[in-house]
Amino acid sequence: MREIVTLQIGGAGNAIGDSFWHVISHEHGVDYASGRFGGTSPLQLERINVFFNATASKRFYARTILIDTEASTIQRLNASSQLYRPENFVAGSESAGNNFARGYHTDGAAILDQVLENTRREVESVDSLQGFQLLHSIGGGTGSGLTSLIMEALVEQYPDNLLCNYVTIPSPNMSQVVVEPYNALLSTPALVNNSHLTFCLDNEALFQICNRNLKLKMSGYEHINHIVALTMSGITTCLRFPGQLNAGLRKIYVNMVPFPRLHFLIPGFAPLVTCKQQQFSKGTVSELVQQIFYSNNLLCAIDLRKGKLLTAAGIFRGRMSPREVDQLMTGVRNKNINNFVDWIPNNIKTAICDIPPRGLKMSATFIGNTTAIQTLFQRLLDASMSMLRRKAHLHWYTGEGMEEQEFQDAQQELQAIIDDYRSSAEGEDSGGGGGGGGGRSGSAESGEEEATPEAHCQYCTE
């Protein structure tokens, strides 16, 4: 079995992680509160060990480590479910205070050894580890600083395994902390050089989905976390269930990442409509294919029309014709040929799993590697440069042991990744500038083929 170890870090990472375990535990027939199996299909158990540890008595535990520099968030999760192993809660004694420096140098560093010890124990309990899944925000101190520290250690200790990050990126219209641009900036080197797959999310796009698509009058973080969890469930479907394509993290990496540094991906999901709208929807594969390319269905505020797609993938769930899916996806590429780079052949992939998500007959998850993401990076760079020119709030970081040169180095790294994506739109080699790729491997795993080109409302948390 090709297992994945999850690390959910900081307040946002643990909230998203908890929603993810809610969603996939139900899909696998595991009761979230007790961890007991109550499913009805052997398919629910066939590949359950990818994300769950199983006992002889059919008791299941999430293969995850819950990490925060303060204990309050993860203590609530410990009390809410027996799905989590008590020994896998790692908490410090003091919050990182929305400060990358405290997450990286002081408060986060104080619990790093315990995090790595728990990780080692989880890794030793699996048969064949394929990689790590890290859930975090880069706007706060723990999610940015401690995650960067953890990633550096994981790459050093497990160089043959992939790191997959689900990252909540600060949005200027949703900012709650004045130093978020600094924290996001300082996270850049670790994400560029140590992550293999980085799925970019932002709260502004997610709240717009809640308000515009789902017509929720009082949307909260529980709603947006649920949308993220649905999308993560879609991305991991082919890892967790048998289907047309039994993919692994490495296959996703090989198919989606043309150069090691260009691994920042935009996820999307369809359908994202209200229950009433679903009643009037035809519910066709054609509709799903159209919707996953709409900016309104992306979990990051990116306009695909403002860049070119290097690679794209659609992961479909439900009973449908593989031939129809392939034809429709190929048709999208042919009709929008100018929105795809011409130097990567067969750069649109499909995968199908017969098992639909809860409450839907069919769904589709989008993954896009687009040069339009440079607009997001430029936004982060501009915000941090504006503050750094004035040396605004810099003393909060230098007081924790950081130097101003570290900010300048991070800005250079961020500018380099912007340049890499910009040049890739013209087909220039974007693989070498600005840094290495710790623990990277560009080839498929031995023995694996490259992936083939190819009632209850889901959005309510009650």
From Swiss-Prot:
| Gly residues bias locations | 430-441
Please name the PROSITE patterns in this protein's record.
Answer: TUBULIN (PS00227), TUBULIN_B_AUTOREG (PS00228)
Q: Which residues bind GTP?
A: 70, 137, 141-143, 203, 225
InterPro entries from the entry? Answer: Beta-tubulin_BS, Beta_tubulin, Tub_FtsZ_C, Tubulin, Tubulin/FtsZ-like_C, Tubulin/FtsZ_2-layer-sand-dom, Tubulin/FtsZ_GTPase_sf, Tubulin_C
Q: Mind telling me which PANTHER family this protein's record contains?
A: TUBULIN
Subunit record text: Dimer of alpha and beta chains. A typical microtubule is a hollow water-filled tube with an outer diameter of 25 nm and an inner diameter of 15 nM. Alpha-beta heterodimers associate head-to-tail to form protofilaments running lengthwise along the microtubule wall with the beta-tubulin subunit facing the microtubule plus end conferring a structural polarity. Microtubules usually have 13 protofilaments but different protofilament numbers can be found in some organisms and specialized cells.
What name is this protein filed under? beta-Tubulin at 65B
Task: Please tell me the species this chain comes from.
Answer: Drosophila melanogaster
